[in-house]
C-alpha cells in the first residue's frame, strides 16, 4: 500500500505498508487527514519518519504524539528539539521487518534526510517531480550532491516527494529547452490528473531523468544557475 494523503495546501503525508506489517508514515504537517485514514482502514502505525524541520512537515508532531503516544518518531538532528523520539543520521534503520536506507540529502535544509523503503524513495523537499527544493539552511553544493545521489538510484525507483508542485515545475522545465517533447507530454498528463483532483505523484526516477532539468545538469555551476532561475520563475 502506497497512499499520498493530501494535507495543508499542497503537501502529502505518505503512508506505506507492506502486507501483514504496520504502517510507516512520512512527515506530519497535520493530523486530521492521517488519523481519519488510519481509523477508517483499521491500520496500526509502526513509525513516523521525519525528513526535515520545516513547519509544513512537522507542524502536527505534538498532536501526533497525543494520538499515537507509543509510536517511535525518527528524524534528523535538526528536529531533536521538535519532539522526535530518536535522532538518526544516514545509514540503515530497521523497523519491524522494514529495512530502511536513510540517505543524507541536505541542501533544502542542512540535515535533510530521505528514506528508501522497498524501492520507494520518500525524498521530502529534496527532489520533486520535474524540480527540486529551494536551498534554505543548506547550501547549493549540498543540494547538487544530494540530487546526484538520488539520480544514482535504480531507474525503477518510485519517487514520493512531499509536495504537489508538478504543474509549476513542468512549466519551468519547458523554458529550459531540455527534452521539450517529454516535458510537454507529461504536462498534458498532469493537467488532466489535477483537473480531476488526482495527485500527479508518485513518479519514477526513469521519468524524472527525462523531464527534470535538475537531474540533467552536469556541474555545480550549472545547477546554481538553474536553481536561481527557478527561484524567480
Curated annotation (Swiss-Prot):
It is an enzyme of class 3 (hydrolase). GO terms for biological process: methylglyoxal catabolic process to D-lactate via S-lactoyl-glutathione. The keyword Ribonucleoprotein does not apply. The keyword Magnesium does not apply. It catalyses: an S-(2-hydroxyacyl)glutathione + H2O = a 2-hydroxy carboxylate + glutathione + H(+). Zn(2+) 1 binds at residues 52, 54, 108, 125. HAMAP family: Glyoxalase_2. Thiolesterase that catalyzes the hydrolysis of S-D-lactoyl-glutathione to form glutathione and D-lactic acid. Belongs to the metallo-beta-lactamase superfamily. Glyoxalase II family. This is Hydroxyacylglutathione hydrolase. It comes from Histophilus somni (strain 129Pt) (Haemophilus somnus).
Amino acid at each position: 500500500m502506497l497512499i499520498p494523503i493530501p494535507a495543508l495546501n499542497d503537501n502529502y503525508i505518505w503512508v506505506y505498508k507492506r502486507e501483514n506489517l504496520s504502517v510507516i508514515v512520512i512527515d506530519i504537517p497535520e493530523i486530521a487527514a492521517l488519523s481519519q485514514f488510519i481509523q477508517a482502514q483499521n491500520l496500526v502505525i509502526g513509525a513516523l519518519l521525519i525528513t526535515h524541520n520545516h513547519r509544513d512537515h512537522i507542524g502536527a508532531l505534538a498532536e501526533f504524539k497525543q494520538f499515537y503516544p507509543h509510536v517511535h518518531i525518527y528524524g534528523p538532528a535538526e528536529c531533536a528539539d521538535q519532539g522526535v523520539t530518536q535522532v538518526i543520521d544516514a545509514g540503515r534503520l530497521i523497523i519491524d521487518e522494514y529495512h530502511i536506507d536513510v540517505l543524507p540529502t541536505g541542501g533544502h535544509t542542512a540535515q535533510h534526510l530521505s528514506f528508501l523503503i522497498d524501492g520507494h524513495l520518500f525524498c521530502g523537499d529534496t527532489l520533486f517531480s520535474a524540480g527540486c527544493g529551494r536551498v534554505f539552511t543548506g547550501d547549493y553544493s549540498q543540494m547538487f550532491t544530494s540530487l546526484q545521489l538520488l539520480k544514482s538510484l535504480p531507474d525503477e525507483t518510485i519517487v514520493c516527494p512531499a509536495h504537489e508542485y508538478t504543474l509549476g515545475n513542468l512549466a519551468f522545465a519547458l523554458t529550459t529547452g531540455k527534452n521539450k517533447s517529454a516535458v510537454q507530454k507529461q504536462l498534458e498528463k498532469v493537467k488532466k490528473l489535477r483537473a480531476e483532483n488526482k495527485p500527479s505523484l508518485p513518479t519514477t526516477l526513469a521519468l524524472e531523468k527525462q523531464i527534470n532539468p535538475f537531474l540533467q545538469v552536469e556541474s555545480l555551476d550549472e545547477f546554481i544557475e538553474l536553481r536561481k532561475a527557478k527561484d524567480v520563475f
